[in-house]
Amino acid sequence: MGIKGLAKLLSDEAPLSLKEVPLSHLHGRKLAIDASMAIYQFLIAVRSGGPGGQNAAMMLTNADGETTSHIQGIFNRTIRFISEGIRPVYVFDGKPPQFKSGELLKRREKRLKAEQALKAAEESGNIEEQDKQSKRLVRAGTKENEDCIKLLTLMGVPVIRAPCEAEAQAAALARSGKVYAAATEDMDALTFRSPVMVRKMTFANASKSDVQQIFYDKAIEGLEITHDQFVDLCILLGCDYCDTIKGIGPKTALKLIREHKNIETILKHLNREKYVVPDIYVEARRLFNHHEVLPDNEIELKWTECQPEPLKSFLVDEMGFNPDRVQASIEKLQKAFKASAKPQSRMDSFFKVKANPEGDKKKAEKRKAELAASRGKGKKGKGGGGFKKK
């Protein structure tokens, strides 16, 4: 889930922290990719139409009926990364923290509701609803993870098994300088203090070539708060470890943090009869600030040439992929790896950018004003001049 509403809040309050760039802009960068998030996205996106086009889209499978959508997605996308000169390292989730059990229970309840809705849609023949509910039932299990670990190892791409949350481990890799950024859709990578976060890296739609970079320092600066206050803000917004306070939205949460500095002081000024405050926010704060990750000295990132024959055997014999297409892709991978192995410098390494805090502040204020103006125009003509509920 990540942090509820944080992306929108940064867009409104700290627009300079967000930057859309083409994938090629990351040439020469090492990126720690949230593997579970990537696998989930490909399980949903890489699908085939039902027989005769009369049934809901289905995930790709091999002759034994085992799902292969995630394998095709990770294989093709990783080749694309390496072709762009990017060095990916995939980080897999370990055991979830105990205080995430509440969130996991909610997810199980949602899955049960989706199963019931899917059954009803199948009985009524509603294809659109079948597709919608089947996507809600998708999850990456142990087998999908192990399949991808085997694939990536044969491709020569490093894999890390995090002791706990993948986003926390990816953020730690970025903080230590072993990689440039944590690549995930979960905004809590910023709460774990990744200097740079990259989103949309594993979108399966090839036409969506742009990725989004989010810069931690500029986010903190734009929000006008400290890191400790940012952690408390994320807890108030709602995270995997702690429910949000119902009735307090992102804007109000930011206002309260700016005014009172921390959750403890906010609680002293909050009407406890009106607002229900989760009692585990202290533990949630501890998890964000002291999450279990592998020590830097235990991590060695090494990219190697792929193992052509074992890789082809895995994809063709086990996954049921087309031999000719697999061979062509392996040759493309080998060519991309050799090209990326040559010493190359990024263009921005030739230039030293002079900091201009005052200029950045003016840009941020201008951007905020533009956003406010555009929202104001959108509200004209609405009945009574009120807000439109979504």
UniProtKB/Swiss-Prot annotation:
Residue span of region I-domain: 129-260
Compositional bias annotation for Basic and acidic residues: 349-370
PTM annotation: Phosphorylated. Phosphorylation upon DNA damage induces relocalization to the nuclear plasma.
Cofactor(s) the protein requires to work: Mg(2+)
Comp. bias (Basic residues): 376-390
Family matches, as HAMAP family: Fen
Superkingdom in the source lineage: Eukaryota
Record protein name field: Flap endonuclease 1
Annotated binding of Mg(2+) 2, by residue: 186, 188, 240
PANTHER family reported in the protein's UniProt record: FLAP ENDONUCLEASE 1 (PTHR11081:SF9), FLAP ENDONUCLEASE FAMILY MEMBER (PTHR11081)
SUPFAM superfamilies the record matches: 5' to 3' exonuclease, C-terminal subdomain, PIN domain-like
Gene Ontology cellular component list: mitochondrion; nucleolus; nucleoplasm
Enzyme nomenclature, EC number: 3.1.-.-
